[in-house]
């Protein structure tokens, strides 16, 4: 291949698309788009943009306050809006972080076939854009709104009422602040939602078809857990890690009614870092419970 890429320049667009489709998002975004104009045109083909997944990049990048800056959010927004345009309405999966209401509303207006939406750690996504998602993306099957503090139980109600195909919900919260200091803004850590039972009630009343639920570090009580177990009879997986207001007895007595349940992730024991005595006392009550969940034994 010549340095200017001319040997590839004569390839039919469908062949180029086939080749480029094998690249990761990061490879595509930093490579072929800058080879020549014809390649840029091919890289914008709707066929390549039914899925927009930045999770592999975020997983490989160390958490830092830079990711929470307005400048970084603008970059993510620009990428998301561009992909929405290139998909020509065919986008079915979005997995990003640190986006805003503006970009998400833009996607909601133009991607009615969206089935998977993951926007964890997006401090400027609110109920406003999520309401648009609820009304305009009714085919939604999976939703991850973990660490999104400006999203309230109102979103859970609207999604539950308007997206009957929802099977997976991830609403995990951040754990004890000491593990995030230095990488997450302090004011954001302090604003972590406290209304666990209200959110649990919304889930139980409006998400009857849920099969997979993650609510790590929720502040829900046994009342909230009862609402979920009563209202979501199809649950197969329930993640309660870090939900320290629930005892082993609370969990066992409530999940026993879930006949399809395959796995429960219990609050577990917190293993503190050196010198973190206060946290040991807070989470140490789980040391009283060393029995393991036996789902089969709970069934009649």
Curated annotation (Swiss-Prot):
SUPFAM superfamilies: F-box domain (SSF81383), RNI-like (SSF52047)
Domain spans labelled F-box: 11-52
Compartments in which it is found: Nucleus
InterPro entries the record matches: F-box-like_dom_sf, Leu-rich_rpt, Leu-rich_rpt_Cys-con_subtyp, LRR_dom_sf
Keyword hit for Nucleus: yes
Main location: nucleus
BP GO terms, sorted: protein ubiquitination
Gene Ontology cellular-component annotations: nucleus; SCF ubiquitin ligase complex
A Pfam family that the UniProt record links to this protein: LRR_6
Keyword Nucleus among record annotations: yes
Pathway noted in the entry: Protein modification; protein ubiquitination
Keywords assigned: Nucleus, Ubl conjugation pathway
Stated role: Component of SCF(ASK-cullin-F-box) E3 ubiquitin ligase complexes, which may mediate the ubiquitination and subsequent proteasomal degradation of target proteins.
The protein's assembly and partners: Part of a SCF (ASK-cullin-F-box) protein ligase complex. Interacts with SKP1A/ASK1 and SKP1B/ASK2.
Entry text on domains: The F-box is necessary for the interaction with ASK proteins.
Listed name of the protein: F-box protein SKIP1
Organism expressing this protein natively: Arabidopsis thaliana
Gene that produces this protein: SKIP1
């Amino acid at each position: 291949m010549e340095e200017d890429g001319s040997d590839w320049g004569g390839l039919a667009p469908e062949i180029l698309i086939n080749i480029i489709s094998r690249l990761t998002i990061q490879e595509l975004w930093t490579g072929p788009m800058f080879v020549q104009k014809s390649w840029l045109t091919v890289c914008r083909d709707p066929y390549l943009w039914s899925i927009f997944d930045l999770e592999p990049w975020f997983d490989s990048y160390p958490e830092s306050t830079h990711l929470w800056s307005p400048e970084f959010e603008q970059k993510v927004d620009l990428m998301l809006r561009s992909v929405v345009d290139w998909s020509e309405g065919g986008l079915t999966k979005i997995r990003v972080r640190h986006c805003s209401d503006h970009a998400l509303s833009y996607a909601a207006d133009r991607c009615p076939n969206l089935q998977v939406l993951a926007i964890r750690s997006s401090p400027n996504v609110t109920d406003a854009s999520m309401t648009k998602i609820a009304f305009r993306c009714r085919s939604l099957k999976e939703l991850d709104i973990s660490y999104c503090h400006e999203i309230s139980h109102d979103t859970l109600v609207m999604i539950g009422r308007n997206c009957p195909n929802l099977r997976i919900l991830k609403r995990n919260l951040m754990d004890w602040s000491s593990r995030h200091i230095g990488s997450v803004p302090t004011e954001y850590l302090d604003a972590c939602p406290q209304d666990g039972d209200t959110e649990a009630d919304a889930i139980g009343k409006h998400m009857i078809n849920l099969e997979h639920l993650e609510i790590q570090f929720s502040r829900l009580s046994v009342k909230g857990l009862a609402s979920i177990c009563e209202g979501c009879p199809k649950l197969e997986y329930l993640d309660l890690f870090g939900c320290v207001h629930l005892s082993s007895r609370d969990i066992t007595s409530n999940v026993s009614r879930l006949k399809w349940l395959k796995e429960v992730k219990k609050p577990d024991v917190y293993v503190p870092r050196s010198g973190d005595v206060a946290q040991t006392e807070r989470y140490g009550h789980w040391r009283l419970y060393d029995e393991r969940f036996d789902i089969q034994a709970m069934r009649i």
